[in-house]
């Protein structure tokens, strides 16, 4: 009887945690806000839209390169949420295909976002979709702590 109560309590907590996790939402960042925040954080931001002109579902692209360390953070604004979900899914699959024997990964999702983090083969990869925007990061693991501060400041 005691084991059943403990098991029920555990299942109840997991269920509540799962349900509340799905109701969490994030505020999306606009292209202008991304440029401003990244510039203030010592990044050089360039408009990368010309590299994606043939993709009509991509509205805006900004590439932010850290002035001192040289790693890059990419920000995409897509036509709508469905395109962003597809873009996220395709890039997540690419990240997953790069897994080596030793890796760590984390996934989370909420009402309007999905996030995937993978560390493998000395690379740190982060993909976050919030509504119709996607933050894409594929850098050397040595910059992990620095880029996590950037991600946190963006709210992604």
Regions found by a protein language model. Name each.
Residues 23-25:
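Bacterial signal peptide processing site
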Residues 1-5:
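Positively charged n-region of N-terminal signal peptides that target proteins for export
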Residues 66-88, 137:
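A short acidic-to-branched-hydrophobic micro-motif
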Residues 19-21:
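C-terminal motif of bacterial Sec signal peptides marking the signal peptidase cleavage site
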Residues 125-143:
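Short, exposed beta-strand-loop hairpins at the edges of beta-sheets
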Residues 36-54, 84-131, 151-156:
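Short Gly/Thr-rich strand-loop-strand
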Residues 44-76:
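Secretory pathway targeting signatures of secreted, lumenal, and periplasmic proteins
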Residues 6-13:
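Sec-dependent N-terminal signal peptides
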């Amino acid at each position: 009887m005691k084991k059943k109560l403990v098991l029920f309590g555990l299942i109840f907590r997991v269920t509540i945690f799962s349900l509340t996790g799905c109701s969490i939402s994030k505020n999306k960042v606009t292209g202008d806000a991304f440029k401003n925040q990244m510039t203030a954080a010592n990044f050089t931001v360039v408009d990368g839209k010309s590299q994606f002109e043939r993709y009509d579902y991509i509205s805006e692209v900004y590439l932010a390169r850290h002035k001192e360390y040289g790693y890059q953070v990419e920000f995409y604004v897509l036509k709508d949420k469905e395109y962003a979900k597809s873009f996220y899914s395709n890039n997540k699959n690419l990240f997953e295909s790069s897994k080596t024997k030793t890796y760590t990964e984390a996934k989370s999702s909420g009402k309007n976002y999905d996030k995937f983090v993978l560390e493998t083969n000395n690379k740190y990869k982060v993909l976050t979709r919030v509504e119709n925007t996607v933050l894409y990061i594929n850098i050397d693991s040595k910059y992990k702590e620095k880029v996590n501060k950037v991600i946190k400041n963006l709210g992604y």
